[in-house]
Swiss-Prot record:
Family: Belongs to the class I-like SAM-binding methyltransferase superfamily. RNA M5U methyltransferase family. TrmA subfamily.
Organism encoding this protein: Shewanella sp. (strain MR-4)
GO aspect biological process, one term: tRNA methylation
Protein name as annotated: tRNA/tmRNA (uracil-C(5))-methyltransferase
Highest taxon of the lineage: Bacteria
Length: 365
């Protein structure tokens, strides 16, 4: 965190600097003009994590400022959603006088939605007992008069859900509303309004597509569910079981009937497509029946591994969302040999940081 950089009056200038840096970094690939999608300058993060500082009877949230090299008290937090800021104040007022709930509490995580739900995770350096459960249930009841809230308690090898461990987000994407189950402690796009812009951009660049879509690293189905409208069928892979379970829920709640999720890594799928290995998880799925002219990838920060990159290169069109411009640039060194970048976008998921979320559409030369 860098508190000094979090100044909404400088947001536009900081975003312009990011765009220039991105253009310069990718100039060798002769990319088209960068499409820039700005964030709200404040209250844009739908999740936030805070450490807890105990000082006598006082109790407060803090973060570590890497520039000041010190902890900074956070009674409110400009990047966090308005809902998180409201909950921060209400929760700390409840925790301060309650010995059972504050005892050895060291962290609080918030996950909120545009649809008005919020999940609060309380993390402890002690095992949680029946008294904690009783006090937490009473806390939830009191907070429920103001919030659509659920509470989770966590300790070493222990997790207590008072009700459920997820929220359901609703995103208005063009003329449709998509509903997404977002599970506590699983990856979700933190900036919901920019996430909407990412979905709308991905839908736009894949309009009038022919055939089917293959997606690797699909998470909770965020992109594949929205993109299903542009393809005959969608085949998507994801390794993390909680994300796969959420994706199946999201497919059902959004009434998507042309999307198949497979629980396997991108590397495993590459082996399956190359017929190097067979997998029981693929029983009943005829990979050869899919006519995937387009592949969508949203890899982790490490980028795409060499075997999967070779697989990706075999498709006519490649839609690549990247959370790390350095590994995207490395991957483009190979992809650029056979494909040309025809759309290029910067999504400002993380204002006031150096982080750049990018999107590229590549089409075979």
């Amino acid at each position: 965190m860098n508190l000094a950089a979090m100044d909404p009056t400088t947001y536009d200038a900081q975003l312009t600097a990011k765009r220039i840096k991105l253009e310069q970094a990718f100039a060798q690939f002769e990319t088209p003009s960068v499409e820039v999608f700005a964030s709200e300058p404040a209250h844009y993060r739908m999740r936030a994590e805070f450490r807890i500082w105990h000082e006598g009877d006082d109790l407060y949230y803090y973060m570590f400022d890497k520039v000041l090299n010190d902890k900074v008290r956070c009674d409110q937090y400009l990047p966090a959603s308005a809902l998180i800021n409201q909950m921060m104040a209400a929760l700390i007022a409840e925790l301060k006088p309650n010995h059972s709930l504050r005892h050895k509490l060291f962290q609080v995580d918030f996950l909120s939605t545009l649809s008005g739900e919020i999940l609060v995770s309380l993390l402890y350096h002690r095992q949680l007992d029946d008294q904690w459960r009783s006090e937490a249930a009473a806390l939830k009841a009191r907070l429920s008069s103001q919030f659509k809230v659920n509470i989770i308690g966590r300790a070493r090898k222990q997790k207590i859900d008072l009700d459920k461990d997820f929220v359901v987000e609703s995103l208005q994407v063009n003329d449709k509303v998509f509903h997404y189950k977002q599970i506590e402690n699983s990856f979700t796009q933190p900036n919901a309004k920019v996430a909407i812009k990412m979905l709308e951009w991905a839908i736009d660049v894949t309009q009038h597509s022919q055939g089917d879509l293959l997606e690797l690293y699909c998470g909770n189905g965020n992109f594949s569910i929205a993109l299903a409208q542009n393809f005959n069928r969608v085949l998507a892979t994801e390794l993390a079981k909680p994300s796969v379970d959420a994706a199946q829920y999201n497919i059902e709640v959004n009434n998507i009937d042309n999307l198949q999720i497979i629980r396997m890594s991108a590397e495993e799928f590459s082996d399956a497509m190359a017929k190097k290995r067979s997998f029981r998880r693929l029983e009943g799925i005829d990979l050869d029946s899919y006519v995937c002219n387009t592949i969508f990838v949203d890899p982790p920060r490490a980028g795409i591994d060499p075997a999967t990159l070779e697989l990706v290169q075999g498709y006519e069109r490649i839609l690549y969302i990247s959370c790390n411009p350095d590994t995207l640039k490395d991957n483009l060194q190979q992809l650029n040999q056979t494909h040309k970048v025809t759309r290029f976008a910067l999504f400002d998921q993380f204002p006031y940081t150096d982080h750049m979320e990018t999107g590229v559409l590549l089409e075979r030369r």
